[in-house]
């Protein structure tokens, strides 16, 4: 494994991690893991990247605050529901269609576009996650898989084509709406844990675009 493929694996893991945070409420066991040495080391290492430092430290600060809540898991689950599962007037709905399609309806063209990406690369949506294809967690899970597929390409031309596809996907399917999604999450998530997650997501996406574009 060379340095680039190893870095790609790290990128995929980060996208899968962010996908898991935005797909469902954290269980008690998962929340306890966020206090572990392993996870805290992962976050500390991530914060060593200067462009990510502020966003990661904001998330660490919220994690520390979560640990101090009386019923941490239940309260954080309520925060998740308030942040993402309400109406478009009260929550930051995690679907691209809500931000990119004038109809304001779920399962609009952005969802169709996402289904086409899934089909093109033969990546299946997880059967147990029954959400429209343009849910943020599905898009991030897809991106992680696309990065891993990139590492599996044999020729340099194929490898570069897959790297280019990642750049196109991030620009068209994610950065086209996640900054606004993050802004609304900041407004609606009173405790701020999930706003810290979406803030880190947008920061990481912008940094990743620079990497993929060779800047």
From Swiss-Prot:
Its main location: cytoplasm. It is found in: Cytoplasm. GO terms for biological process: protein complex oligomerization; protein folding. One of its GO terms (cellular component) is cytoplasm. Keywords: Chaperone, Cytoplasm. Belongs to the TorD/DmsD family. TorD subfamily. PANTHER family: CHAPERONE PROTEIN TORD (PTHR34227:SF11), CHAPERONE PROTEIN YCDY (PTHR34227). HAMAP family: TorD. Involved in the biogenesis of TorA. Acts on TorA before the insertion of the molybdenum cofactor and, as a result, probably favors a conformation of the apoenzyme that is competent for acquiring the cofactor. This is Chaperone protein TorD. The lineage of its organism: Bacteria, Pseudomonadati, Pseudomonadota, Gammaproteobacteria, Vibrionales. The gene is torD.
